[in-house]
């Protein structure tokens, strides 16, 4: 019997619109955007922040070292990154609905301290949840098995009593391998009824 609903956060309970954000800063300058993306994302900085191995200052230094000609633009990108995070209007009502059904609601997310501090307001749904795990807190990221075990150990959960949803199929596949039930999140309109049917 499922007693616990476990959510990913990014692009599930909160939208992370990086491409839209970058175009709002730099228009259609694809060379600039691709270079900054390379310096922040593809060299592993963002993933290292998610894992608690780097902070924002270290990411800035690394990205600037990769593309010193764009130092000003890289700093602007990181300074205004809060604008890439957007609330989902359905997040709090959904969590509240689960609570009314007598279920527990948790989060399990690849998320950095930098992102939490950049825009804490988009995480307001957490106040209505029973808890959760951010990857930076435990130095493990999905789909590493350790992060799923960390959630269960922290709250005394049995994996078979948990339903996990994430927009990344590999993360759901790993959750299932760890004993969770799982549904890939493919947008609220499509996935909400599937999850609620599985929970009832």
Task: Indicate where each model-derived feature is located.
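Generic structural signal for small/hydrophobic residues in well-ordered secondary structure
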Residues: 8-11, 52, 98, 107, ...
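Alpha-helical elements of Rossmann-like donor-binding domains used by nucleotide-donor carbohydrate transfer enzymes
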Residues: 20-21, 44, 58, 62, ...
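Hydrophobic alpha-helical core bundles mediating ligand binding, dimerization, or RNAP-core interactions
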Residues: 22, 40, 59-64, 78-81, ...
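Short, surface-exposed acidic
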Residues: 28-38, 67-79
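A metal-dependent, Asp-based hydrolase signature
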Residues: 46-77
